[in-house]
Structure formats: structure tokens, C-alpha cells
Regions:
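N-terminal beta1-alpha1 cap of cysteine-dependent amidohydrolase-like domains
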Residues: 1-84
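Cysteine-nucleophile active-site neighborhood
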Residues: 62-140
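Conserved beta-strand scaffold positions in the cores of enzyme catalytic domains, especially
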Residues: 38-40, 115, 145
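Catalytic beta-strand/loop cores that center a nucleophilic Ser/Cys/Thr
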Residues: 135-158
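Generic structural "secondary-structure junction" signal
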Residues: 15-18, 51, 100-101, 115, ...
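Fold-independent oxyanion-binding glycine-rich loops
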Residues: 8-10, 41-43, 58-60, 92-95, ...
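Residues that mark the start of a beta-strand
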Residues: 2-4, 112, 144
């Protein structure tokens, strides 16, 4: 088995060292004898989601995220089809808010891709940056547990 990981726009979305997430995945796959390669996409590149097994979408500053959001809207239908067909997306930091319906910044509300029915709001007095806990009525399992199970499956069962 050989996996292909697509890293979307690491030149713009690498605020908290998301290249480290790629390095960690690659090392864990190597330990398990799974061959993998990474393709980094810049904002002007065409993305063929059919070639990707995992997509990483990192976080960036508001300016960079708005640039990326506009680009992702151009390829939204292909990205959404990838997700709906069972494609794996690891959205970190601000990357996950781009997938939702909208998110708020100091400049106002930014329309997202609406691939996932979520939205994020900025804190009243300051930006909320830290680990999060989510609640969902979709399952008795917490979202955090679901994410851990998905990643566990990816890295241990292949």
C-alpha cells in the first residue's frame, strides 16, 4: 500500500508548524511499513483530489486564511466531492473553520466552504487559541474521540 498526502498551501497555512504534522504522519507510517509520499500544493496549483488519500489543511493568519478561502471556493465542488466520497481531511487550527459555513474575524464574518455544517465565532475580547472540546448530537461519541479513532485507524490498522 502507498499513501499520498496532499498538503494544501503550506506556504500560507503554516502558522503553528503544520509541516510538523506531515513529518509526524510520515514517520508513523514508516514505522508501520506503509509507503507514503507528500505533495505540497501552492495556491495557484491545480489539485487533483482523486490522487490523494489524505489532505492536510493547516492554519494561518486571518489574511492568509482569507486568500486560501477564496482559492478553495474556486475548487469547492471537487473538494466537497472528495470529502463526501470518504476522503480523509486533517484540518488543523484555522483550517477546519474554512470547511464550515462561516467564521468571524476582527474584519467581520467570512463565508466558508460549507462542506461541514459548523461555524466558528471569535471570542468577545480576544482570540481563542488553545485545545478545544466539541459537542455534537451526531453521535454519543465526542468529536475528539471520533478524531482519535479515525487517526488511530489510519496509523495502526493499515
Amino acid at each position: 500500500m502507498k499513501l499520498t498526502i496532499g498538503h494544501l498551501y503550506p506556504d500560507l497555512l503554516n502558522l503553528y508548524g503544520d509541516r510538523g504534522n506531515i513529518q509526524c504522519m510520515m514517520k508513523r507510517l514508516q514505522w508501520r511499513g506503509i509507503e507514503a509520499k507528500t505533495i505540497e500544493f501552492e495556491i495557484q496549483d491545480e489539485v487533483d483530489f482523486s490522487e490523494l488519500d489524505i489532505v492536510l489543511l493547516g492554519g494561518g493568519s486571518d489574511r492568509e486564511q482569507m486568500l486560501v478561502c477564496e482559492r478553495l471556493k474556486e475548487i469547492r465542488d471537487d473538494f466537497k466531492a472528495y470529502v463526501e466520497d470518504g476522503g480523509v481531511v486533517l484540518a488543523v487550527c484555522g483550517g477546519y473553520q474554512l470547511l464550515g459555513t462561516h467564521y468571524s474575524t476582527d474584519q467581520g464574518v467570512i463565508e466558508g466552504l460549507s462542506i461541514v455544517d459548523i461555524y466558528t465565532e471569535q471570542g468577545k475580547d480576544y482570540r481563542l487559541i488553545d485545545n478545544i472540546v466539541l459537542e455534537s448530537e451526531l453521535s454519543d461519541m465526542s468529536v475528539r474521540s471520533a478524531v482519535v479513532r479515525v487517526l488511530w485507524s489510519l496509523l495502526w490498522l493499515w
